[in-house]
Amino acid sequence: MKKNIKILAGSAILAVASSAAVQAGELTVATVNNGHMITMQSLTGHFEKDNPGIKVNWVTLDEGTLRQRVTTDIATKGGQFDVMTIGMYEAPMWGAKGWLHSLEFGSSYDVDDLLPAMRNGLSANGNLYAAPFYGESSMIMYRKDLLDAAGMSMPDNPTWGHVQDAAAAMTDKANGVYGICLRGKPGWGDNMAFLTTMANSFGARWFDEEWKPQLDSPAWNHAVNFYVDLLTHYGPPGSSGNSFNEILALINEGKCGMWIDATIAASFVSDPSQSKVADVIA
């Protein structure tokens, strides 16, 4: 199998809702419950000190729930949230619809320092609608010790066939070690973003040039079956409920031979204070 792994660019984006009715002295921020967003919350005191009289309220949710609630709120002009973390997929479309305020910064924020791809991806009609907290792509994280023991290596551009072979070689269910961990929890913010990039590498696409759905194509059938088989044979039990945080806990406990997910995970899996296998993760 020579389907090459493709990269999905992503980010945590701070955007301001145009429909939010800010109560005097309060800002409500909706964000995802990953480590870096939790760290961001620790800066609340600095903001409130510099802006006396403004209190920041945080609504922290898992990724799937966050996307559902934010999308519903902003589309219906509910006004629950003033500031929110969204992705590059949503920012330009929502901005063009007038759902987000365009952002204008003072001289202390160097907009020109933003990577062009990030800035362009967050803009519509020449206006910037969100500011990146970080930018990321996806990558393979793997246990060097397990791969070495299996007599294998990880090339710079692995195919899905190689990933499958490596997962099989590293799986040791008797000792609670599974060759690969992938998001299995249903949802755009969970398994579907990953599955879309996997399907692309199999030649699948959501629509053709005339916007006709292509989900019943042989390429989609191949990709979905490959994904299911990979997790069924070499993934941990309960994969259908796993998203980023669940898999992070598994890999840090040494339960996963390999994980394909956001590059933001690197700072956690390589941290000896968080991961039991930090010294053997590549």
Predicted ranges, named:
Residues 4-10, 22-93, 97, 105-112, ...:
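Conserved N-terminal structural module of periplasmic/extracytoplasmic solute-binding proteins
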Residues 166-169, 209-241:
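Glycine-centered hinge/linker elements that transmit conformational signals in sensory
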Residues 61-69, 89, 158-165, 238-252:
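Short helix-initiation/N-cap motifs at beta->coil->alpha
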Residues 101-116, 156, 184-187, 202-222, ...:
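Short, solvent-exposed loop/beta-turn-alpha elements that line the ligand-binding surface or hinge
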Residues 10-18:
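Bacterial N-terminal signal peptides
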Residues 225-282:
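Extracytoplasmic/periplasmic substrate-binding proteins
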